[in-house]
From Swiss-Prot:
Protein name: LexA repressor
Origin species: Ligilactobacillus salivarius (strain UCC118)
Marked site positions, Cleavage: A93, G94
GO molecular function, one term: serine-type endopeptidase activity
DNA-binding region as annotated in the record: 28-48
Subunit structure: Homodimer.
A biological-process GO annotation: negative regulation of DNA-templated transcription
EC number assigned by the record: 3.4.21.88
Top-rank EC class of the record's enzyme: hydrolase
Keywords: Autocatalytic cleavage, DNA damage, DNA repair, DNA replication, DNA-binding, Hydrolase, Repressor, SOS response, Transcription, Transcription regulation
Annotated NCBIfam families: lexA (TIGR00498)
Family matches, as SUPFAM superfamilies: LexA/Signal peptidase, Winged helix' DNA-binding domain
Length: 206
């Protein structure tokens, strides 16, 4: 990487950080101050190079109209799938129902996760997991995996291809999907498919 390319990378990184922190891109003067350049014309030159490489898009008639393209995000290793979790539908915490994988929306990656790789989010319907603090209407963050240890909370697919959120136990000759609700019975299965392990929870308090 040449000195000029390093400077352009620093500018691109600062634009991304400013948008992430403030919700809008910086001015050229703010870029100057951030990367240690005194001339706005020098920054304009670097921005033109970034634009010609397809890393940003600009509107020259507006002072803050700088948008980082997907190619620019890829260079920064900040593609959306690294920082957002797909919301793929609804799963039951009651009687099993089909989980609908719609990929209709995305949820920002919580700060305690390093990467969104292999994560997805499901909305919970039902009250079978209330003793574990998972309530009707909550959204759970799930890590895709095909196995689980006894006692872990999982999203499991039954023999009828219906998905449910339960605590997993492998018993002698069968599987037990245990609800966390004293009024409900466990689901006993000869075969079960683990879709993933529940690793987080989000609840809208508003």
């Amino acid at each position: 990487m040449t000195k000029s390319e390093k400077r352009q990378h620093d500018i691109l990184r600062y634009i991304f950080s400013h948008v992430s922190d403030s919700g809008y891109p910086p001015t050229v003067r703010e870029i100057c101050n951030a990367v240690g350049l005194s001339s706005t014309s020098t920054v304009h030159g670097h921005l033109s190079k970034l634009e010609s490489k397809g890393l940003i898009k600009r509107d020259p008639t507006k002072p803050r109209a700088i948008e980082i393209t997907l190619a620019g995000l890829e260079m920064l290793d900040e593609l959306p799938n690294k920082t957002q979790i797909p919301i793929v539908g609804t799963v039951t915490a009651g009687e099993p129902i089909l989980a609908v994988e719609e990929n209709r929306d995305y949820f920002p990656l919580p700060p305690y996760f390093e990467s969104a790789d292999d994560l997805f989010m499901l909305s919970i319907r039902g009250e079978s997991m209330i003793n574990a603090g998972i309530l009707d209407g909550d959204q759970v963050i799930v890590r895709k995996q095909s196995s689980a240890n006894n006692g872990e909370i999982v999203i499991a697919m039954t023999e009828e291809n219906e998905a449910t959120c339960k605590r997993f136990f492998k018993e002698d000759g069968y599987y037990r999907l245990q609800p966390e609700n004293d009024t409900m019975d466990p689901i006993i299965l000869e075969n079960v498919t683990i879709l993933g392990k529940v690793v987080g929870l989000y609840r809208d308090l508003i």
